[in-house]
Amino acid sequence: MEIGSNLKRLRTNEGLTQTQLAQKLNISRVNYTRYETNASRPDYETLVAVADFYDISLDELFGRA
């Protein structure tokens, strides 16, 4: 499973739009969309920010837990 599908699942479970989440993470919506569609991979800092936002581990973010 690619990380993009996990990102989308987490976001939609929270009832957030891509724009809302991108603003909370201080990244552009375009970049966030690329992460969800697996067109681009988030850097480590972004991954940590996402995991912190959802209060999950990086393993959970990658679907390993």
Predicted regions and their residues:
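DNA major-groove recognition helix of helix-turn-helix/homeodomain DNA-binding modules
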Residues: E45-E60
